[in-house]
């Protein structure tokens, strides 16, 4: 059944899924990544982190700070309609956000970060696909309370060039384009995923200002029973 659904997809969509999953339809949905990079919070801070996600939930735990120092503990997460962001220095909490706006924004982030878990994007897993052009494909699926429409720019081989979606930013701003440019990819067994990205609000517009740069240096497909370490 999964193979039949795959065959019925537009060619650019098949090209991406075949490239990302090696043509397999039995892959696990959830992955764990080892990430390092830098994030702009006023100044640029370097981080080391672990991310888990499946396109419908995520957990990101990071240690961040200037230079070699990693003074900040960061935990962003989303699952089952609820999102939160917690930042602390040792036991001193600096940020503790878990309101409705945080949850809606985190749902959009969970969908965009599915480029790291392509096993979660197969059509038999509730994802509706269409091709906008030979080099742009669109995936839509439910990430309650949102239903994001994720646009992927792809190359001739199906490699991801960018990911973009309208993501909730807050009651004042509403939905704003958020996305990432992809500079490198790598294969980890059957999966081929972006491994060097820059991301930010206003993607695809003159207002784009990346504030997050990340490099993936490890990937593990997790058993079905594993959930985010919330």
Show the residue positions of the predicted features.
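Flexible, processing/modification-adjacent segments and terminal tails
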Residues: 86-143, 173
């Amino acid at each position: 059944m999964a193979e039949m659904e795959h065959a019925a997809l537009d060619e650019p969509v098949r090209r991406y899924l075949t490239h990302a999953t090696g043509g397999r339809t039995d892959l696990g949905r959830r992955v764990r990544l080892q990430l390092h990079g830098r994030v702009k919070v006023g100044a640029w801070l370097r981080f080391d982190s672990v991310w888990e996600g499946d396109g419908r939930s995520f957990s990101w735990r990071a240690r961040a700070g200037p230079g070699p120092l990693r003074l900040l503990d960061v935990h962003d997460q989303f699952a089952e309609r609820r999102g939160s962001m917690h930042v602390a220095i040792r036991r001193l909490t600096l940020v503790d956000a878990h309101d409705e706006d945080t949850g809606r924004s985190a749902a959009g982030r969970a969908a965009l970060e599915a480029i790291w878990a392509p096993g979660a994007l197969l059509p038999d897993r509730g994802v509706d696909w269409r091709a906008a052009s030979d080099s742009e494909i669109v995936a839509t699926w439910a990430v309650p309370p949102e239903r994001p429409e994720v646009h992927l720019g792809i190359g001739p081989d199906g490699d991801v060039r960018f990911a973009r979606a309208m993501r909730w930013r807050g009651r004042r701003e509403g939905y704003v384009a958020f996305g990432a440019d992809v500079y490198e990819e790598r294969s980890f067994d059957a999966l081929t995923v972006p491994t060097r990205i820059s991301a930010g609000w206003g993607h695809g517009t003159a207002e784009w200002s990346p504030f997050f740069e990340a490099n993936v240096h490890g990937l593990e497909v997790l058993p079905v029973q594993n959930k985010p370490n919330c």
